[in-house]
Amino acid sequence: NDLPHIGHAYTSIICDTIKRFYILKGYDAKFLTGTDEHGLKVEKAANNKGVLPNKFVDDISKNFINLSRSLNILNDDFIRTTEPRHKKTVESFWNKLVKNNQIYLDKYEGWYSIKDESFFQEKELLKTNDKYQTIDGGDVEWIKEESYFFKLSNWEKKLLDYYEKNPDFIKPISRRNEVISFVKSGLKDLSVSRTSFTWGIKVPDSDKHIIYVWIDALTNYLTAINFPEIDDNNQVFWKNAHHIIGKDILKFHAIYWPALLMAIDFPLPKTIFAHGWWTNEGKKISKSAGNSIEPNYLISKFGLDQLKYFLIREITLGQDGDFSEKSFINRINSDLSNSLGNLISRTIKFTNKHFENKFPIELDGNILNSKILVSGYNLIEKYEVNIINFELNKALEKVWFFINQVNQYIDKMEPWSTIKINKVKTAETLSILIESIRLIGIILQPFIPEAAKKILDILNIDNNSRSFKFYNMKYAMKKNHPLNDAQPLFPRYNA
């Protein structure tokens, strides 16, 4: 119900990186994002602005669509929960729950947070001066109203069994342990409708009940695969689906969602991965604190690839991270401008000056099996394992270890000195360097796609020869392959 911030950008960048990785590996991959537009929180925010909810969410969704464009993410679908196709999915989902005897009508009495759009048991709240609040200090109110309930308590044992048999279902392990502990403490049936507001999808055959916003929101995943008429292709996608979420909505995705899917006899997604939060110089980002970090500001000032690189490289996926402009500038200057940018600039400029904009020599078996190139060719195996296991920063660490090896190689070989006395040896050195840069350009495409494209353009690599299939010595560059002029890739900034 507000402008997108760095946390929204972070989730999108993670998903986009993973999708680009699988595309480069030759897989068919789909990336879904969207906006959750119903509920009391949205209704109140619209009222406060003096506009109708539908006008309010139209404006909000445009901000998120524009963010996706600014981030240049490869999403295949953007689902708004106010769309007719989504309403159809939600109603079908609800009717299946009813048909399977998973829903009943009763009275709800308990604590509710408008901000979190969530019901809370007393054990989940903090009590200060006779006032209950959520752990992060949010207000809760005691409500009493008629409500439909989902028989969540019936699924406690089956959830625990599933977690045990599928240890990779919830990641990272700290979040898995958190969920298991919560479920073991006991689950109560879940209130899944409200009568105190009107902005939402109505319960079928009911005039006054609105479907709980989190059932509405979660089923957007099913809207993406055209539930309930799911074709074979979408069934394969669902079987391998990864839900990438912020840790604040883990309970809904790792407890309510699998229980709801089990209740309609529908398979569960492959993985629920909960990433951490970003703070701003040690302080939690919030609207009231006025310390929101605007992605578009960072993109316009420093560049899109710089933002993507920092967010992925700076922290382990799943942990919290702290943002400061100083640490941002230090990271991109050190890694992108110094290590990577300077390597490419000095290698290509020197080669083009002394070898007429052409790849100097044919790489024979001895050169291809040189220590530096073997290190480069072998890099991709562990890199792929890291990404498949959501260890994105570790994958980048491995790439930068290789980049540093290549920088050490150029300093050791000193082509600027050997060109005066041994042009053949210099040609070999430069050819090893340029082939290493080709590998770097290919392997960085999921993380910094615009810069990686420029690197491969400088090397004049055909657009059809940039997938991971070509990260192999049999596709090494050939003698006299034309090279383009080097261009600035990463400007330096003052901290």
Regions found by a protein language model. Name each.
Residues N1-Y162, N166-D168:
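N-terminal, positively charged nucleic-acid-binding surface of large information/translation enzymes
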Residues H38, N291, S375-L379, S436:
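N-terminal alpha-helical segment
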Residues N1-T33, R85-T89, I135-K353, A395-V399:
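Structured secondary-structure scaffolds
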Residues I65-S68, W94, V98, G341, ...:
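Structural signal for well-ordered, non-membrane alpha-helices
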Residues T17, K55-N66, S92, S339-R346, ...:
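A non-catalytic, amphipathic alpha-helix used as a structural packing/dimerization or gating element
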Residues W111-D116, G276-W278, S327, E362-I367, ...:
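A glycine-rich phosphate-binding loop feature that marks nucleotide/adenosyl-phosphate handling sites
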